[in-house]
Amino acid sequence: MTALSNIRNFSIIAHIDHGKSTLADRFIQTCGALQDREMQAQVLDSMDIERERGITIKAQSVTLYYDHPNGERYQLNFIDTPGHVDFSYEVSRSLAACEGALLVVDAAQGVEAQSVANCYTAVDLGLEVLPVLNKIDLPQVEPERVIQEIEDIIGIEADDAPRVSAKSGLGVDELLEALVERIPAPTGDRDAPLQALIIDSWFDNYLGVVSLVRVRQGSLSKGDKILIKSTMDSHLVTSIGVFTPKPLETGKLEAGEVGFVIAGIKDIHGAPVGDTMTHAKTPDVDLIPGFKQITPQVYAGLFPVDSSDFEKFREALQKLQINDSALFFEPDTSDALGFGFRCGFLGMLHMEIIQERLEREYNLDLITTAPSVIYEIKKKNGEILLIDNPSRLPDPGFVEEFREPIARCHILVPQDYLGNVMTLCMERRGTQVDMRFMGKQVQLIFDIPLGEVVMDFFDRLKSVSRGFASLDYEFDRYEVDKLVKVDVLINGDKVDALAMICHQEQARYRGGQLVEKMKELIPRQMFDVAIQAAIGSQIIARSTVKAMRKDVLAKCYGGDVSRKKKLLSKQKEGKKRMKQVGSVEIPQEAFLAVLQVDNQ
């Protein structure tokens, strides 16, 4: 077993594309954990989607043995963290398991908001943060400017920051030496009762739930009976070890170490991320602080195109949920779309990934309704409701207050694009909280309704700032506002899946835009199709998809006008009858038109 003083637990904090996974690959290669023939790019990103999108979704860990030039052998436990704003809770759990973090910054691009947010989390948790300049071999690097930015924005010394190129391996040996010297060794009593933090859990078809844990106090061996604090369920440990990145059984983990535990747990909710694990014989061990149940922020309806796929869809969601405790779903029915599920996600990226995995891994064809957030409704009798689906809103007559969730947004933007970004935030009904100039960058803090943020705010922010602005947001509070529900009627019938909640001042504009958009997307029928947007019983916008008609007068050459009138009125009668019985097929694009209303 490695002595406590020779263990280093660390994480890498980096913005998307700043080279975190590549640096991890270099560490693995330098320490000889995998043979060269087994190396592939982004070793730790195991899902195809992770590789394709170049993002890390689940936390992974790897234990490396590093021989220091001073002759000592060190055990380095690297815990990989997701970088995207949707997965910030997983980041905080990964960081809580470490004593230090490497802040990897692209030496050409500089500091981004996400790294700042995660870096603050690390500092709050008391971690030693070691800044690293990556991509130093690129021609356009500006290390002096970036060092100044790190000092101005994050407030940590960066003069002696190691300069590396993860791609070519330049400076990686020096970085490993600095890591061992700068990051403190873990503390912990190996004879105390067991206290271990669950960093991540995932499901294996043969082994059940595999938990990645960091042992804080005590030790854990194969054959021990363990207890999960939040569920108070006990399980028998069947396998225990470390990832090197391949699983390697060690039979024991001691204080300060990071590894995996398999105890035949059948359900991912049986080992929630952030929970505390202990021995069944010492159930009153203190909880490790910071554990919270994950709550979805964004809800959307998912419906199979072919209703016979419903059971297959349910199974697919259950399988995904086994591996993703943040995914929530419940059965939902829609008059327009039939049977499906109302699903809750952490954010828009999470939603896209789940949808893509359902379609790719389970061959499902799905229709997605526009996403919405949770609103708080206070009824006149004092009852408070939480509404995640616009079609479930009570009648406006019973509602006393309509409260919407507000997100606190931290935006970092170069000064040149400040005006565009502020205009965008104002358009989204944002209120400015703070603004600080830091070198060439400006840090903005805005309070913006969460419903506006989750729609397409991130994409719009990137486009108005040419990709330079970066965003981090978290839910802050509920606030009363004048909100209304806009219904869409097609030929007088409400289509529940198209309903949306928006601000009273924007309702006419958004209703009008939606109706126009629908007009382009609904194919022409043999009869007129009226598309209307309404608030309650008041119609606020209307548009008509004109009928296709056959030229019934083609065979009348000349002849009496009454003959023509007769043929036309006969056609008119037929269309009228058809309209009474005809139903309109609504294509998938039309359901997503709600999303594109703001993109004009």
Swiss-Prot record:
One of its GO terms (cellular component) is plasma membrane. GO terms for biological process: positive regulation of translation. Its EC number is 3.6.5.n1. GTP binds at residues 17-22, 134-137. It is found in: Cell inner membrane. Residues 5-187 form the tr-type G domain. The keyword Hydrolase applies. One of its GO terms (molecular function) is GTPase activity. Required for accurate and efficient protein synthesis under certain stress conditions. May act as a fidelity factor of the translation reaction, by catalyzing a one-codon backward translocation of tRNAs on improperly translocated ribosomes. Back-translocation proceeds from a post-translocation (POST) complex to a pre-translocation (PRE) complex, thus giving elongation factor G a second chance to translocate the tRNAs correctly. Binds to ribosomes in a GTP-dependent manner. This is Elongation factor 4. The gene is lepA.
